[in-house]
A protein has these predicted regions:
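Conserved acidic donor-binding segment of nucleotide-sugar-dependent glycosyltransferases
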Residues: 311, 315-322, 331-337
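Short hydrophobic beta-strand element within catalytic cores of glycosyltransferases
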Residues: 292, 296-299
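Donor nucleotide-sugar binding/catalytic pocket of nucleotide-sugar-dependent glycosyltransferases
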Residues: 136-186, 196
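A short, histidine- and acid-enriched strand-loop-helix "catalytic/donor-clamping" loop
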Residues: 94, 109-129, 144-145
C-alpha cells in the first residue's frame, strides 16, 4: 500500500517538499514529464536531489506544446496501491480520472489538489485562462482538500469551499544556507567581472516575459533617486526590447545572462535588495530564495509569494504604480547596510521549512 502523488514535472524549487511528502506521507511520486521544457533547468542536478525514484506516467500527450497528458495507467496505480491519500495537480484531466475512479468504485481515499492559484487570480477574477476558472468551479467542490501556495488564497478557499491547507513553495533552509556559503567564491568573481565593488545592487531573477512586468519595472527605475546598480539575471523573448528600453532611463542596468544552481545563488549573495515586479504571478519561488539569502525584498502584491513578506523582510508594491514602485526601491536601498565583502546574510524567511511541513502533514492526516 502506498499513497500517490501526481504532478506534471519535477521542479527544483519544490524538491524539498516532494522529498518530505515521499518520506513523511509515504507517497509514490508520479510525473507526466521528466522536466519543465519551458524553463532552462539542470535536470541531472534535480534528479540527484530527489530522495525518491520518480515514476513517469504513460499516456497520450496533447495540447499546445504537448504539455497536457491523458495518463493511461492512473486507475491501475490506484487499484494496485490502495492509497489513503492521493495528491493531484489542481484542475487537470488526471484529477478528473482520479475522482471518477473514487466515485465509480466507491473508494474512501482522500483526494487533495495541489493548486498554484494566486490571490490576484481568485479575488480579482484574473485567471490565466477561462478554462482554469471554470475548472475551479467544477472540481474544487469535489476534492476533499486543497494544498495552496498563498495564505490569502487559503483563506479565500476556506470562505468559498470550506477547504484549504497552506503549503507555500519553499526550500529547506538547512540545505540551502550551506549552498549559499559554497557559492561565495562565485559571488566574488561576479563583483569583479561586472564592476560591482562598492555599489549597492538591486537584483531581479526570472524569465523576460510579459507577465513579469519588466517594462514598467525599468520605467520605475528611471524614477528612482538612490545610487545603485540593477542586475537582471535571466533570459527570454523580451530581452532585446528591455535592453533598448534601459538605454533611455539614466540608470545602470546589467543584463547578466541566464544562470542555474550555484550560479544563481551567487547572485543572491551579491544583492542588497531583491525585486519581483510581476503583474501576473501564480507564486514566484524566487522570493523564497532571496529571503533565505537574506535579501530585503520588494514584491508585487499580485504575486502569490507576497504571503512571505512581513514588515521585517520586505514590502509589497502595486505593479502598475510606477511612482510607488520607485519609492519602495529607494526606501529599501536607504534601509539596507551595504557590505563590500561577500558574506552569507541572515535568513529573512518568517518561518522554518520543517514547521510548515509538520503542520501540512498533520492536516492531511486528519
Amino acid at each position: 500500500m502506498a499513497n500517490l502523488f501526481f504532478r506534471t514535472s519535477i521542479a527544483p524549487y519544490r524538491i524539498d517538499t516532494y522529498n518530505a511528502l515521499h518520506e513523511r506521507l509515504g507517497c509514490m511520486m508520479c510525473f507526466y514529464h521528466t522536466f519543465d521544457s519551458s524553463q532552462k533547468l539542470n535536470e541531472e542536478g534535480m534528479r540527484k536531489e530527489c530522495k525518491f525514484t520518480p515514476r513517469y506516467l504513460k499516456g497520450i500527450t496533447f495540447g499546445s506544446g504537448e504539455t497536457r497528458k491523458f495518463c493511461t495507467e492512473v486507475w491501475t496505480l490506484l487499484r494496485s496501491n490502495k492509497p489513503n491519500v492521493v495528491i493531484v495537480p489542481e484542475y487537470q484531466l488526471l484529477t478528473i480520472q482520479v475522482l471518477l475512479y473514487k466515485f465509480i468504485f466507491r473508494k474512501k481515499f482522500k483526494v487533495i489538489s495541489m493548486c498554484d492559484d494566486s490571490f490576484d487570480m481568485v479575488n480579482n477574477d484574473h485567471d490565466f485562462t477561462i478554462i482554469h476558472k471554470w475548472a475551479r468551479k467544477l472540481i474544487a467542490p469535489l476534492v476533499d482538500d486543497m494544498l495552496l501556495v498563498d495564505s490569502r488564497v487559503r483563506d479565500w478557499y476556506q470562505e468559498h469551499y470550506k477547504k484549504g491547507i497552506w503549503l507555500p513553495i519553499v526550500r529547506d533552509e538547512k540545505k540551502e544556507i550551506p549552498n549559499y556559503e559554497r557559492s561565495l567564491p562565485i559571488s566574488k568573481k561576479y563583483k569583479e567581472q561586472f564592476n560591482l565593488a562598492g555599489r549597492k545592487v538591486l537584483l531581479f531573477v526570472g524569465r523576460f516575459v510579459v507577465e513579469k512586468n519588466l517594462d514598467n519595472f525599468i520605467k520605475a527605475l528611471g524614477k528612482t533617486k538612490e545610487d545603485f546598480v540593477t542586475v537582471m539575471v535571466g533570459s527570454g523573448e523580451l530581452e532585446g526590447q528591455l535592453r533598448e528600453l534601459s538605454k533611455g532611463i539614466g540608470k545602470e542596468i546589467v543584463f547578466a545572462g541566464h544562470y542555474v544552481d550555484d550560479g544563481v545563488r551567487a547572485w543572491y549573495n551579491v544583492a542588497d535588495v531583491f525585486v519581483l515586479p510581476s503583474k501576473q504571478e501564480a507564486y514566484g519561488a524566487v522570493t523564497n530564495e532571496a529571503l533565505i539569502a537574506g535579501n530585503y525584498s520588494v514584491i508585487s502584491e499580485s504575486a502569490g509569494s507576497a504571503c512571505l513578506i512581513t514588515q521585517d523582510n520586505g514590502c509589497l508594491v502595486n505593479p502598475y504604480d510606477l511612482d510607488g514602485m520607485a519609492s519602495a526601491i529607494d526606501n529599501a536601498m536607504r534601509m539596507v547596510r551595504h557590505k563590500d565583502t561577500c558574506d552569507v546574510k541572515d535568513n529573512l524567511m518568517p518561518f522554518l521549512f520543517d514547521d510548515i511541513i509538520n503542520k501540512v502533514i498533520t492536516e492531511i492526516k486528519q
